[in-house]
Every structure is written in structure tokens, then in C-alpha cells.
Design a protein with these regions (language model features):
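Short glycine-rich, low-complexity segments
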Residues: 1-58, 77-101
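Short aromatic-glycine-enriched beta-strand elements
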Residues: 69-74
Length: 101
């Protein structure tokens, strides 16, 4: 079971380019077993993790280049840990770092 502890917002698409956001995601994905994971706010809301009214998805895995756009693997963890899908990085509004406790 995950306990959600807010750390910080590390990317904001209103103030950052897709290239900058991709660079941040690649940096975090490169760290293995560091106790952190990422959640993102998307335009196509999928799961409300923290009850705050912010609709979030959890990002995990690698950055991929697919059909001319950067994408990342995402999994909705609250209801079905195995429910994975591709997220377009261009749809990300902001990225939050959480700590697994």
C-alpha cells in the first residue's frame, strides 16, 4: 500500500517545453530503487489519487518515441496496479514527485 507524501512539483508545462519535461522524466526514470515515483496531472483525467480534486496518473518506466511524439508508460495504481497505458508527454500539465513510505 502506498502512503502519499507530497514532495514538490518538478515540471510545469505552462512554463516549460516538452523537451525540458522529457529531460526531467528521463533523469528520474534513470534512478533505480530510489524510493521515489512520479505522478502527473493530465488533460485526460483518469484517477483521483489523493482526494484533492486533482486527477493524477502515476508514471513509471521509460520515455519512448512513438508516432512522432514522446510518450511514457503510465499505470493507474489505485484500483488496478496492472492497468498500464501510454501517456503523451505533451498532455502533461505538471509533474509531482512523491516519496514511497
Amino acid at each position: 500500500m502506498f502512503h502519499y507524501h507530497y514532495i514538490k512539483v518538478i515540471a510545469d508545462s505552462e512554463n516549460m517545453s516538452t523537451k525540458e519535461i522529457t529531460s526531467i522524466l528521463q533523469k528520474y526514470f534513470a534512478k533505480q530503487n530510489d524510493g521515489f515515483y512520479l505522478e502527473i496531472d493530465l488533460d485526460d483525467h483518469a484517477a483521483d489519487f489523493d482526494g484533492s480534486g486533482k486527477w493524477l496518473k502515476r508514471l513509471e518506466g521509460n520515455i519512448l518515441w512513438l508516432d512522432g511524439e514522446y510518450v511514457a508508460l503510465s499505470g493507474v495504481q489505485q484500483n488496478n496496479p496492472d492497468d498500464s497505458f501510454i501517456v503523451k508527454i505533451s498532455t502533461i500539465r505538471y509533474i509531482i514527485v512523491h516519496n514511497k513510505e
